[in-house]
Regions:
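Structural core segment of the AMP-binding/adenylate-forming
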Residues: 29, 72-73, 100-174, 188
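Conserved AMP-binding/adenylate-forming core of the ANL superfamily
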Residues: 42-88, 92-96, 113-118, 171-174
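Conserved AMP-binding A3 loop
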Residues: 53-57, 173, 194-221
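Conserved structural elements of the adenylate-forming
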Residues: 60-65, 177, 209-232, 240, ...
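Conserved AMP-binding/adenylation subdomain of ANL enzymes
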Residues: 217-236, 246-285, 298-300
Length: 302
C-alpha cells in the first residue's frame, strides 16, 4: 500500500488509526475500576456519623442502578442532576451514575448564600436535586423560588427520611429500588458535558463551568503520572476537598482509574475527626485546602 509522503497520490485520503479507537468517557473509567480494582475499598462517614464500607465493584453496580432509575424517570442525556451534599457514599455513586449515563452532574456548594443557591440551581436548570438529609433545611426556605427542579432525592434510606414540609421528596433507596444495574452505558460523545460547577460569584453572579468526559479522563491520566499526583492502587486517599468544589480536583475519577482506596469524611471536617479517619484507614495521601491542613497540623502537634 502507498502511504502519504511515500508515493501516495496527491489528494489521497488521510489514514485513520484504529488502535483503541474508543471515546474517552467516565463510564469507561468506572467499568475499568470495577473490572480491575473491584475489591479495592471505599470508606465513608454517613450522615448519622457511622461509617460504611463498599468497593469499586459496588460503586459500579449502584451507579448502574442510578442510571436505570433516571431513565425510568424520563431523564434525558444532557439533563442536569444537581447535588447538595457532603463527601459521602451516595454522592460518590452519583458522580459515576449520572455522568456515565450521559447526564450532567451539577454539584452545588451548600456554604453559599441562599440567593446564590437559587441563582445557581435555576441557571443550571437541574431537573432533580439530590440532597443530604442534614442539608434539607437549606432547601426548605428556597423551594418556591426554584424554577426547574421537579423532584428532590434525599440521600438516605427510606427508614431514615427526616420530617420535612418539602413536596415530592423521595429517598435515595426508593429511587434505585427494583432497578437493574445498567450493564452497558449508553453511547456518549466524549466532548459532551459531564459535570457542571459554578464560581462563588465574588464579582457579579456565579458563572457555570462545564467539564467534558474527555477533559475529565485526560485529567485522570495526568493525576496518575509520576510528576503530578502519582496516584496509584497502593494509595489510600483521604478526600477532604469537597465533592462540590471543582469536582474534588478530579480525584474521585482518578482514584477509580488507578484503583486507589478512598476515605470520605462526610461533614466531619474538624481536625480530630480527620486525624482519626486518616490514622484509622492508614491514609497515604490527603487532599484539602491549606486552612484545613493548618488546623490539622495544630491538632497533631498539641
Amino acid at each position: 500500500m502507498s502511504l502519504p509522503g511515500f508515493g501516495a497520490p496527491a489528494g489521497a485520503a488521510t489514514l485513520t488509526g484504529l488502535m483503541q479507537a474508543r471515546p474517552l468517557t467516565i463510564g469507561s473509567v468506572i467499568d475499568h475500576a470495577a473490572q480491575h480494582h473491584g475489591r479495592r475499598e471505599i470508606v465513608a462517614r454517613r450522615h448519622d456519623g457511622r461509617f460504611e464500607r463498599a468497593d469499586w465493584a459496588t460503586v459500579r453496580d449502584r451507579a448502574g442502578r442510578i442510571a436505570s432509575s433516571l431513565a425510568r424517570l424520563g431523564i434525558s442525556q444532557g439533563d442536569r442532576i444537581a447535588t447538595l451534599a457532603w463527601n459521602r457514599m451516595p454522592h460518590l455513586e452519583l458522580y459515576f451514575g449520572v455522568t456515565s449515563a450521559g447526564h450532567v452532574l451539577h454539584t452545588v456548594n451548600p456554604r453559599l448564600h441562599a440567593d446564590h443557591l437559587v441563582y445557581i440551581l435555576n441557571d443550571g436548570g437541574a431537573r432533580l436535586l439530590c440532597v443530604d438529609p442534614d442539608l434539607l433545611p437549606l432547601v426548605e426556605p428556597i423551594i418556591d423560588r426554584l424554577t426547574s427542579v421537579e423532584r428532590i432525592i434525599v440521600l438516605c434510606a427510606r427508614s431514615e427520611m427526616p420530617e420535612s414540609g418539602l413536596p415530592n421528596l423521595v429517598s435515595f433507596d426508593e429511587l434505585i429500588e427494583g432497578a437493574e444495574p445498567m450493564a452497558e452505558w449508553p453511547k456518549v460523545d466524549e466532548n459532551a458535558a459531564s459535570t457542571l460547577c459554578y464560581t462563588s460569584g465574588t464579582t457579579g453572579d456565579p458563572k457555570g463551568v462545564l467539564y467534558s468526559h474527555r477533559s475529565t479522563v485526560l485529567h485522570c491520566l495526568s493525576a496518575c503520572t509520576a510528576d503530578s499526583m502519582a496516584l496509584s492502587a497502593r494509595d489510600c486517599i483521604a478526600l477532604v476537598t469537597p465533592l462540590f468544589h471543582v469536582n474534588a480536583w478530579g480525584v474521585p475519577f482518578a482514584a477509580a482509574m488507578c484503583g486507589a482506596k478512598l476515605a470520605l469524611p462526610g461533614s466531619a471536617l474538624d481536625p480530630a475527626s480527620l486525624f482519626a479517619l486518616m490514622a484509622g484507614e492508614k491514609a497515604t495521601f490527603g487532599l484539602g485546602v491549606p486552612t484545613v491542613w493548618m488546623s490539622f497540623v495544630d491538632h497533631v502537634e498539641r
